[in-house]
């Protein structure tokens, strides 16, 4: 039973989690054999019951009710949809309707089609001997069915021919989410991979990045502004520069993000920025090695992404080799301002007019309008009906509760 399973895991102080693409387990060495046995059971014979399916489905739907009203969640949803496309897995999002369409049989079919030993890698890190663990794994996973897994195909994401503003109206927003995103061909095997990492660190990879120093330290428009460069071995990666800002500085923030990106493209970074970025990568990399799951992910990446055996052994030396010229070339290749999407999610009645007047590099940017589920719409109309006044609102309310006579009959309020 599921409760017995969870209780035993808790008793051992272990962790065992299952997702749609894999299983992760962690435990003390003395409980390793039993945890490995439970892990094998969850892979080979998962407990897929109607009762648990309905419980998880209802929980997911309840969480969505809150998320649907969240500005940051809406921003992420539309950003992913328009960046990757509706038919790309990274562009899909969960909705009440999509959850209702799923049945337990769909879940079982997914498991049968994709959970194959020929499509799996098992990485074990810890105080173990190879021959001993090989014997145990062979015994426990011996019954795992092999078979071909059919890979899905989907359209290749593209950037717009000219930069455009994607506006998402959220009337309840007290802040705006501004994100500049473009897709890139980028993975760990790229010759300029390490230069791009350093470039991103300098642009907005932390509290010492240019975006943070500009929008937070200098102007005080946000609690933080950051950038990211995300690789993908199988599909397109993305570059993103982002900030959550006050409504009244939304347009100015978008322009400042674009300026900082162009500055990375057009000028060399400083010696101090190079030194700080490399030092930060060195510190983070060394600290990450203390986490066994990080070491396991390194081993998995070497196998699944066709990396050289010494890829992570030479990681820091490759970071150290990056020059200022390398950073500028990588910035020119991956950071874009002319063919990018500028996503702005916020309160249109306060920010839209200024967004429609943004002029960058001598050209006014086109604005497209979307709802919070990524459906393109007409421009929102914020004009107020002339017949509506404070007096009419009060009178309509009085009529709704029964009229003036009923209101005058109220003698006390508790």
Predicted regions and their residues:
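M16/MPP (pitrilysin/insulinase) zinc-metallopeptidase core fold and M16-derived inactive scaffolds
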Residues: 1-29, 89-93, 205-221, 233
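Active-site-adjacent, His/Asp/Glu-enriched structural segments that form or flank metal-binding
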Residues: 1-73, 101-104, 108-119, 251-255, ...
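M16/insulysin-pitrilysin zinc metalloprotease superfamily fold
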Residues: 26-59, 134, 187, 206, ...
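Scaffold signal of the M16-like zinc-metallopeptidase fold and its non-catalytic homologs
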Residues: 35, 42, 67-117, 137, ...
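Short acidic/His-enriched helical or mixed secondary-structure segments at domain edges of catalytic enzymes
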Residues: 59-78, 156-175, 213-224, 267-318
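An aromatic/glycine/proline-enriched structural segment found at the starts
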Residues: 121-186, 346, 353-380
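C-terminal regions of mature proteins
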Residues: 121-126, 156, 275-388
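N-terminal leader/targeting segments and the immediate start of mature chains
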Residues: 378-414
């Amino acid at each position: 039973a599921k409760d017995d399973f969870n209780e035993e895991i808790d008793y051992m102080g272990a962790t065992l989690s299952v997702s749609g693409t894999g299983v992760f387990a962690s435990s003390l060495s003395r409980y390793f054999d039993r945890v490995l046995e439970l892990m094998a059971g969850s892979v080979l014979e998962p407990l897929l019951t109607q009762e648990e399916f309905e419980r998880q489905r209802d929980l997911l739907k309840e969480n969505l009710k809150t998320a649907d009203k969240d500005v940051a969640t809406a921003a992420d949803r539309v950003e992913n949809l328009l960046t990757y496309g509706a038919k790309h897995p990274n562009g899909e999002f969960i909705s009440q309707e999509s959850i209702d369409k799923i049945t337990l049989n769909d879940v079982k079919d997914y498991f049968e089609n994709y959970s194959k030993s020929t499509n799996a890698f098992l990485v074990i890190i810890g105080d173990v001997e190879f021959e001993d663990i090989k014997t145990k794994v062979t015994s426990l996973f011996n019954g795992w069915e092999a078979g071909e897994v059919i890979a899905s195909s989907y359209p290749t994401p593209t950037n717009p021919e000219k930069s455009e503003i994607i506006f998402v109206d959220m009337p309840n927003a007290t802040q705006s989410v501004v994100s500049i995103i473009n897709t890139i061909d980028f993975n760990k095997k790229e010759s300029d991979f390490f230069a791009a990492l350093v470039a991103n660190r300098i642009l907005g990879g932390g509290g010492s990045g240019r975006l943070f120093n500009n929008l937070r330290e200098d102007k005080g428009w946000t609690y933080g502004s950051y950038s990211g460069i995300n690789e993908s071995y199988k599909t397109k990666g993305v570059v993103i520069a982002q900030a959550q800002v006050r409504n009244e500085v939304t347009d100015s923030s978008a322009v400042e993000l674009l300026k900082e990106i162009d500055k990375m493209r057009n000028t060399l970074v400083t010696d101090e920025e190079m030194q700080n970025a490399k030092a930060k990568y060195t510190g983070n990399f060394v600290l990450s090695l203390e986490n066994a799951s990080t070491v396991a992910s390194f081993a998995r990446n070497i196998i699944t992404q066709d990396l050289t055996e010494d890829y992570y052994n030479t990681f820091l030396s490759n970071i150290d080799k990056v020059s200022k010229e390398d950073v500028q070339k990588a910035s020119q290749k991956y950071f874009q301002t002319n063919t990018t999407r500028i996503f702005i999610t916020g309160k249109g009645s306060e920010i839209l007019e200024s967004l429609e007047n943004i002029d960058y590099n001598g050209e006014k940017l086109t604005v497209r309008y979307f709802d919070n589920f990524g459906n393109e719409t007409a421009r929102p109309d914020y004009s107020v009906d002339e017949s509506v006044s404070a007096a009419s609102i009060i009178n309509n309310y009085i009529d709704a509760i029964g009229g003036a006579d009923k209101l005058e009959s109220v003698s006390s309020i508790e």
